[in-house]
């Protein structure tokens, strides 16, 4: 009987793949033989002659109705570039909102246009380009509809934009060398356009405007025709860099060092769809410092990757999730456990596609530093497309310490099934993996597995998962938050749209349960959350009220902070939570998090606030503050974490940013300042100043200063 049920479900899913075909809107690109003036003015004859994409429909607030303002998109191309011209008509041009100028700044609070291009027409991956009326550039790489785009991908492209009496317009230039596509005489690409009108909190799309779709759902995108004889060729990019600086230690043994370093990166197009990258003497002086956090849990904190060499192509290497065992975590390469840099001598990477296969190879050699020996890191990833949007893949990693014979290996297989027309117009995702490791001295109990079922839709948004991480599962180039556990959980969310009292969507969550045991079945952690009320307003504000109940079993004393210890035992505690967030289009926006109630053998109140002030198009200031007031059986303590970012943009190519942070655990004030100039596309100049002060005696005491000037230049053939 069970086999019959499984067979029927499988047939139903396959039927969705076979019959889920629909007519797609088409835009045709026009080839031009003469050059155009790239200035943001779409007044040349070739622009007027190109047929536009129109008929945008609302996704929000009135789903399926025509957009309240007209949008026209035209596409031209020549031998080297793709040109996209966008006319965003607006009946109230004085009300257009555009605050951002800085490259890769968050455009969510601005009027904007977003373009997604699926060059492989695989309905899975796409290049994302977005801009606002100021011509600020944002780009990303879309990996799959169920995942957020990789916002750290940075392509070489340009945009000019301006506000006009009729609205605003943008002219976008994308070199074909920035994209990857098949070597064919005629190209047909997937493409979609999204416009946001902030003052109306309106989202318009050319295609895929249903609530259960959106700009990231490439299976719902339209198509771009008319592209012939595109030559990407064997692209070669050469990025030499030079760095000069001074480091001064102001501690008990003052010292001063001159910093000099040169190196280069090379990018080579092996085929039109496969790219090789090489790096020598890699440097990341311009990368912003991590936001330091006080860890009040028993497990390691996860920090995101920020280094550009490891960000490009990161989606191909992705395997697993950090909370359930991540086989590859690039921060294990070139960074120590406490975030200090370890020199990278050289590295090579191959990423791209070959037919239905996605390929990723990475080989990096690090130098020794202090007690950390040099090591070689190798990662191999292979993934094959299945059906319309699904895929199956394999991964292998190796860490080798030369001269010692020490080798750590990890390997795994994963399957991702995604259906965007399940039961008609619903989304369903099923994914899972199994992985194992081989470590000298560890035998058996070295596996991890996971299954995840997600039903991410507008009215009902539900998921279920189960995973296991055995005690000897040890991917040394990966991340494992917790071992020797089995964890099962899920959530059920109901999100109706009442259309009254200024409420766009209500969010009810009667079930959100995580149940964790050790491998033997002994309960370790239970987390349950009930959301009796949550809502999103028509103006874009968000509110939620949650009731939570937690169980924790401590099998050893837990030193939570300084000399405060929670003893072995079983603990049940209840707590209440409120979250509120305003729309980022406002001059002053922010978010509030408040949680209070039981905490092990005492009480805790958590207060977290984030604010963003957009003083003008050029200047922004953000502030975040997190405060814990904890009372335990052995005494009380408070934690404080402060952080502030200040940014000033002189133009879209010249900006400064400062990041200041402090917490009362490290008792250090950390300043990270960066000036960034883009003299030409792909080339950069940085001026970086870092200063660390100790504050333990309630006075500022300088401990470390670094001043660096760095420049790189792009040569492209």
Identify the function of each model-found stretch.
Residues 1-5:
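Positively charged n-region of N-terminal signal peptides that target proteins for export
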Residues 6-15:
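Bacterial N-terminal signal peptides
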Residues 16-20:
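Sec/Tat signal peptide C-region and signal peptidase I cleavage site
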Residues 21-385, 393-394:
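Structural preference for beta-rich elements and adjacent junctions enriched in aromatics
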Residues 25, 69-73, 80-82, 111-113, ...:
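Structural beta-strand/beta-sheet cores of well-ordered domains, especially the beta-sheet scaffolds
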Residues 208-232, 366-424, 542-595, 606, ...:
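Outer-membrane beta-barrel transmembrane domain signature of Gram-negative proteins
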Residues 253-257, 261, 265, 275, ...:
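Catalytic-domain carbohydrate-binding cleft regions of carbohydrate-active enzymes
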Residues 343, 421-717:
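Exposed, low-structure sequence patches enriched in small/polar residues
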């Amino acid at each position: 009987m069970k086999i019959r049920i499984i067979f029927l479900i499988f047939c139903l899913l396959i039927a969705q793949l076979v019959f889920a075909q629909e007519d797609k809107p088409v835009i045709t690109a026009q080839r031009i033989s003469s050059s155009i003036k790239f200035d943001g003015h779409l007044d040349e004859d070739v622009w007027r002659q190109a047929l536009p994409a129109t008929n945008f429909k609302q996704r929000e607030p009135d789903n399926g109705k025509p957009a309240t303002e007209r949008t026209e998109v035209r596409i031209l191309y020549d031998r080297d570039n793709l040109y996209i011209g966008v006319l965003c008509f607006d009946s109230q041009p004085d009300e257009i909102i555009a605050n951002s100028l800085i490259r890769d700044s968050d455009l969510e609070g601005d009027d904007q246009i977003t373009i997604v291009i699926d060059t492989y027409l695989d309905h899975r991956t796409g290049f994302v380009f977005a801009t606002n009326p100021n011509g600020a550039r944002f780009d990303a790489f879309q990996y799959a509809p169920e995942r957020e785009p990789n916002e750290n991908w940075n392509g070489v492209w340009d945009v000019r934009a301006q506000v006009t009496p009729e609205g605003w317009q943008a002219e976008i230039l994308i070199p074909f060398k920035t994209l990857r596509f098949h070597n064919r005489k005629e190209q047909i690409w997937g493409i979609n356009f999204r416009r946001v009108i902030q003052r109306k909190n309106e989202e318009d799309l050319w295609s895929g405007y249903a609530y259960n779709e959106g700009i990231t759902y490439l299976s719902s995108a339209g198509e771009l025709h008319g592209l012939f004889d595109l030559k990407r060729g064997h692209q070669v990019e050469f990025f030499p860099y030079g760095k000069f600086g001074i480091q001064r230690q102001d501690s008990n043994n003052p010292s001063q060092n001159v910093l000099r370093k040169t190196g280069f990166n090379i990018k080579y197009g092996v085929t039109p769809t496969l790219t090789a990258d090489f790096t020598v003497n890699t440097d990341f002086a311009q990368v912003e410092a991590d936001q330091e956090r006080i860890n009040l849990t028993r497990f390691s904190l996860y920090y995101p990757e920020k280094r550009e060499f490891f960000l490009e192509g990161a989606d191909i290497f992705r395997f697993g999730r950090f909370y359930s065992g991540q086989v590859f975590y690039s921060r294990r390469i070139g960074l120590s456990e406490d975030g200090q840099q370890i020199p990278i001598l050289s590295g090579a990477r191959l990423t791209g596609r070959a037919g239905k296969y996605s390929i990723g190879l990475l080989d990096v050699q690090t130098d020794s530093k202090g007690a950390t020996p040099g090591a070689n890191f190798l990662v191999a990833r292979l993934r094959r497309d299945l059906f319309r949007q699904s895929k199956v893949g394999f991964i292998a990693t190796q860490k080798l310490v030369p001269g010692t014979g020490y080798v750590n290996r990890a390997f795994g297989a994963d399957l991702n099934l995604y259906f965007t027309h399940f039961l008609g117009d619903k989304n369903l995702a099923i994914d899972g993996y199994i992985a194992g490791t081989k470590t000298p001295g560890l035998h058996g109990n070295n596996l991890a597995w996971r299954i995840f079922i997600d039903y991410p839709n507008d009215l009902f948004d539900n998921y279920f998962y189960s995973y296991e991480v055995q005690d000897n599962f040890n991917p040394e180039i990966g991340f494992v938050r917790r071992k020797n556990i089995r964890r099962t959980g899920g959530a059920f969310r109901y999100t109706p749209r009442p259309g009254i009292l200024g409420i766009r969507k209500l969010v009810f969550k009667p079930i959100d349960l995580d149940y964790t045991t050790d491998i033997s079945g002994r309960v370790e952690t239970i987390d349950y959350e009930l959301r009796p009320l949550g809502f999103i307003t028509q103006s874009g504000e968000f509110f939620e009220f949650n009731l939570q109940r937690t169980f924790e079993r401590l099998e050893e004393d837990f030193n939570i902070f300084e000399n405060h210890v929670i003893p072995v035992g079983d603990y049940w505690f209840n707590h209440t939570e409120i979250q509120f967030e305003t729309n980022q289009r406002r001059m002053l926006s922010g978010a509030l998090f408040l949680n209070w109630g039981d905490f092990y053998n005492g009480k805790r109140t958590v207060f977290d606030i984030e604010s963003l002030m957009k003083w003008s198009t050029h200047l922004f200031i953000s502030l975040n503050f997190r405060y814990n007031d904890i009372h335990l059986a052995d005494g009380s303590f408070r934690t404080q974490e402060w952080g502030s970012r200040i940014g000033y943009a002189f133009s879209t190519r010249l900006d400064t940013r400062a990041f200041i942070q402090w917490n009362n655990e490290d008792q250090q004030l950390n300043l990270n300042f960066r000036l960034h100039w883009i003299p030409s596309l792909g080339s950069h100049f940085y001026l970086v100043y870092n200063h660390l002060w100790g504050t333990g005696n309630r006075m500022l005491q300088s401990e470390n200063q670094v001043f660096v000037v760095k420049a790189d230049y792009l040569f492209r053939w």
